[in-house]
Amino acid sequence: MARKTPIDKYRNIGISAHIDAGKTTTTERVLFYTGVNHKIGEVHDGAATMDWMEQEQERGITITSAATTTFWKGMAGNMPEHRINIIDTPGHVDFTIEVERSMRVLDGACMVYCAVGGVQPQSETVWRQANKYQVPRLAFVNKMDRTGANFFKVYEQMRTRLKANPILIQIPIGAEENFKGVVDLVKMKAVYWDEASQGTKFTYEDIPVELQASAEEWCEKMLEAAAESSEELMEKYLGGEGLTEEEIKKALRQRTIANEIVPMLCGTAFKNKGVQAMLDAVVELLPSPLDVPPVPCELEDGTPAVRKASDDEKFSALAFKIMTDPFVGQLIFFRVYSGVMKSGDTIYNPIKGKKERVGRLLQMHANEREEIKEVFAGDIAAAVGLKDATTGETLCDPDSIVVLERMVFPEPVISQAVEPKTKADQEKMGFALNRLAQEDPSFRVKTDEESGQTIISGMGELHLEILVDRMKREFGVEATVGKPQVAYRETIRKTCDEVEGKFVKQSGGRGQYGHVVLKLEPQAPGKGFEFVDAIKGGVVPREYIPAVEKGIIETLNSGVLAGYPVVDVKATLFFGSYHDVDSNENAFKMAGSMAFKDGMRKAAPVLLEPMMAVEVETPEDFMGNVMGDFSSRRGILQGMDDIPGGGKIVRAEVPLAEMFGYSTGLRSLTQGRATYTMEFKHYAEAPKNVAEAVMAAKAK
């Protein structure tokens, strides 16, 4: 079966936004206009096609990114057919991991902003992730029909809060209930969508007189941005020659792909205006797989290489999501970077070192599925029958092995004990938790060795709440959940130049002998643990050095203050001794562990607690209450902003330990009129009284 769409007509994009910016509605409209959905699904009715887990429909928020393939020929039907693969990403901060995964496999993104709320905290997080993976993007300002809608305010916020370089390619005609359509600055025409046809028909008309001056001013800024793409265009522009529509689009495309500008559009997805033009911009301004750099990878021997987006190259793909489908079992979503793969082919997973046979291949459309026979470079599809692959792993041709760069996932900041309600739930719970942890690398499951309890950890209260809920719905496991626990850490503040660990056992027969001397030093926050081998003259034989490191690493799991994991310490092994007969790996492992524990005690150990960046949007009357409450929660105020049309945004850094149950507290402080978002910022040293209380609680 030959390729249906040439690769230069592919667009792999994400639609990304803050909660409630109307992203799922926007995606729904995209599916409607591209002819896939004949009845528009409304999030308000809990019927949206992309939000396909029961919980998402109940909560009205998107949790898992569904991948959908659609086709578009332009809103006027005059473009060659393009294949748009859309990954719908969640906007809630507890699901940042989902956004991060999808950014990794996208070529471009549409950032959806609310015309009233503007650039909100989560928008900044998503923006940083898109910067990290250098994803070219467009901005779509949605909800132009809402009271308080202000397109130009969002433009200013993008410049100040995101440090972006937005370029308007449209301006709105009216706002709030008077929002009628847009002025297309490239064509310098007004565009009106027909409401009776749900926006499938539209007309170009002259620009309203009252907008002419504003349209000319913004058009000039856009032309200047386009002209900066090359010297010849700049000369033409400065010489007073007009630029053709073709030249403008080509120049804007070039600068968008280079991440130098962010073209900005507007509309209201709910009222069927503007999404059609956004789709045109996706095709005209965002990159195809050929426009982005070839994917970097490593060969088997570790040499860096690249794989080009071509069917003629050997097959390579990246698994970016695992989902359990009620009908076909486990689905692995992957992005093909190079080559072709057919169902039934054998592929290799270099991270696991295993070959696997691909069962069925599915093209997903939200939660509908179509079986396909093969996938080509640039495709996003799902495979059934891969048992070993997990998120972030490479799938490649067994005869040409490469590893695409691995994804790095954040450490969880919150834990809860979870217990099955009945004996029958016990086994099912283990299975369910492992399945969920496989799907979501930011969710961890472990058994507490002392209490025997099962501990689940994640990125926030909502994250864990939803996972426990899924356990009940999808796996039928009833579980009781303990109080949330903070994931504290321990580290040291001083250097301990010399600390000795000696493990000697003499009890008849062969003894045990291991002796090491370490130096411990604090590392910069976030640097993690580092082991340095500085042994000279073989005082500790080569073969025992890994055992010393292993002993230290095992000790890292449980610090000396309250048994929390130890971070940001450098341990240098520089001296020791051994015995010809009695020394063995175990003895050196024990010696390493003893030395490290002793060194920790001498190096001014401290307790670290996770600090959260909290933003509260509140009416002005309650601002004093909110700020006073932050102080009582050991919060440090970071600043305030005005919300146009009244209200304030208060920003603070607050220890996670003080934030449990905050949503209830905030509701009663502000009569339910404030909203907040919270995300993990960094670890900071806990004050002495807090550390003592945590240690006392652990000692009980």
From Swiss-Prot:
Gene3D superfamilies: 3.30.230.10, 3.30.70.240, Elongation Factor G (Translational Gtpase), domain 3, P-loop containing nucleotide triphosphate hydrolases, Translation factors. Residues 8-290 form the tr-type G domain. Catalyzes the GTP-dependent ribosomal translocation step during translation elongation. During this step, the ribosome changes from the pre-translocational (PRE) to the post-translocational (POST) state as the newly formed A-site-bound peptidyl-tRNA and P-site-bound deacylated tRNA move to the P and E sites, respectively. Catalyzes the coordinated movement of the two tRNA molecules, the mRNA and conformational changes in the ribosome. GO terms for molecular function: GTP binding; GTPase activity; guanosine tetraphosphate binding; translation elongation factor activity. Pfam families: EFG_C, EFG_III, EFG_IV, GTP_EFTU, GTP_EFTU_D2. GO terms for biological process: ribosome disassembly. Keywords: Cytoplasm, Elongation factor, GTP-binding, Nucleotide-binding, Protein biosynthesis. GTP binds at residues 17-24, 88-92, 142-145. It is found in: Cytoplasm. PANTHER family: RIBOSOME-RELEASING FACTOR 2, MITOCHONDRIAL (PTHR43261:SF1), TRANSLATION ELONGATION FACTOR G-RELATED (PTHR43261). It comes from the Bacteria. Belongs to the TRAFAC class translation factor GTPase superfamily. Classic translation factor GTPase family. EF-G/EF-2 subfamily. GO terms for cellular component: cytoplasm. This is Elongation factor G.
